[in-house]
From Swiss-Prot:
MF-aspect GO terms: ATP binding; ATP hydrolysis activity; helicase activity
Protein name: ATP-dependent DNA helicase dda
EC number from the UniProt entry: 5.6.2.3
UniProt record, GO biological process: DNA replication
Gene name in the database record: dda
Length: 439
């Protein structure tokens, strides 16, 4: 690709980016709807920098899934922004806070390209700006109409600071480049406030199911396409609530795997939170991420068993039934093989959460001398990991990924307010490369 192959908007953004990198006076955010060539422009910028002898180029994404997509499409290895900034979980009483425990060495970083910047919250953005060296130029790429971030402990979503901060020059792409025109046309209208509608060209596009048998027809269509484990990777069902996601996963797993078991050997599952290992170097605790939030792992061994949980100062023990899974890295990520414990039953999860709530309440009102032993709370809580089956995910978890066919379950979207519902639907429609089905 040459400069002449770019759209006028891409050319303008490219020139602004190159000028910003040269002058080092401000950063740049490239904002654009789906199909306007943000990824193409990103790759072109990277290639131009490398071809002119540029060094210190780092690619970052806010999630593991987005990192994988960015690496594949740009042709250069990307990392999660949390790993680049060395952000790890810190516990305070019963809360987990993600903080920067050590300052990373970014002295060699000249250009930091951040993808999917609509997902960056204020705290992460603040850490980013305070960490980069003064000679580093940040190039943010995203779509300000996608799902907005919410600070931990808050209920109100807000637009990412990448689109509002005074130090970021705003470039907007408007000309559609992507070839899947029906999906882009519908996505553009959804982005502007409309609801989904059908549009199919040459057998591909957006199709909905309505009427009394809509859900049944939607699932029949899904199973006409998805028939095995291999088919799950490029076909994703999306819903708003975890309850809907779990129900859809249950239906799909029962059909595909012909089992009522929660987990089976050989199945690919998705981590719903990072798995850390903590060890000491020179007497100092160091945390290492084994599996990232959103990373795929394969089940090698699966056993349903039970264990007792207890905590100092809290009367009694609680018997918790759970799965012991041995899992391994799936795909081309660094290989690990680990044992994890999963509570899959709602009844057992309720019992475990009751124990945690009782422990937290006891420790908040600790009157037995000394500090409350919060380490017991976290030792118990960290015993268990959270995972989900591969077929279905929330819209939030799907943001940043791309699949051949997207299946959108909309009934539970109506629990969201109008603005969020529009963002959810927009993210759902733009996940599919060739087809989008909705009910």
């Amino acid at each position: 690709m040459t400069f002449d192959d770019l759209t006028e908007g891409q050319k303008n953004a490219f020139n602004i980016v190159m000028k910003a990198i040269k002058e080092k006076k401000h950063h740049v955010t490239i904002n654009g709807p789906a199909g306007t060539g943000k990824t193409t422009l990103t790759k072109f910028i990277i290639e131009a920098l490398i071809s002119t002898g540029g060094t210190g180029i780092i690619l970052a994404a806010p999630t593991h899934a987005a990192k994988k997509i960015l690496s594949k499409l740009s042709g250069k290895e990307a990392s999660t922004i949390h790993s680049i900034l060395k952000i790890n979980p810190v516990t305070y009483e019963e809360n987990v806070l993600f903080e920067q425990k050590e300052v990373p060495d970014l002295a060699k970083c000249r250009v930091l390209i951040c993808d999917e910047v609509s997902m960056y919250d204020r705290k992460l953005f603040k850490i980013l700006l305070s960490t980069i060296p003064p000679w580093c130029t940040i190039i943010g790429i995203g779509d300000n109409k996608q799902i907005r971030p919410v600070e931990p402990g808050e209920n109100t979503a807000y637009i990412s600071p990448f689109f509002t901060h005074k130090d970021f020059y705003q470039c907007e792409l408007t000309e559609v480049k992507r070839s899947n025109a029906p999906i882009i046309d519908v996505a553009t209208d959804v982005r502007n406030g409309k609801w989904n509608y059908d549009k199919v060209v040459d057998g591909h596009g957006v199709r909905g199911f309505t009427g009394d048998t809509a859900l049944r027809d939607f699932m029949v269509n899904y199973f006409s396409i998805v028939k095995s484990l291999d088919d799950l990777f490029e076909n994703r069902v999306m819903a708003f609530t975890n309850k809907s996601v779990d129900k859809l996963n249950s239906i799909i797993r029962k059909k595909i795997f012909e089992t009522d078991k929660d987990f089976i050997v050989g199945e690919i599952i998705v981590m719903q939170e990072p798995l850390f290992k903590t060890y000491k170097i020179d007497g100092k605790p160091v945390s290492e991420i084994i599996f990232n939030n959103g990373q795929l792992v394969r089940i090698i061994e699966a056993e349903y068993t039970s264990t007792f949980v207890k905590a100092r100062g809290v009367p009694g023990e609680y018997l918790i039934r759970h799965w012991d899974l041995t899992v391994e890295t799936y795909g081309d990520d660094e290989y690990y093989r680990e044992k994890i414990k999963i509570i899959s039953s709602d009844e057992e999860l309720y019992k475990f959460n009751l124990f945690l709530a009782k422990t937290a309440e006891t420790y908040k009102n600790w009157n037995k001398g000394g500090k409350a032993p919060w380490s017991d709370f976290w030792d118990a809580k960290s015993q268990f990991s959270k995972v989900k089956a591969l077929p279905a995910s929330t819209f939030h978890k799907a943001q940043g990924m791309s699949v051949d066919r997207a299946f959108i379950y909309t009934p539970c979207i109506h629990y969201a307010d109008v603005e969020l519902a529009q963002q959810l639907l927009y993210v759902g429609v733009t996940r599919g490369r060739y087809d989008v089905f909705y009910v």
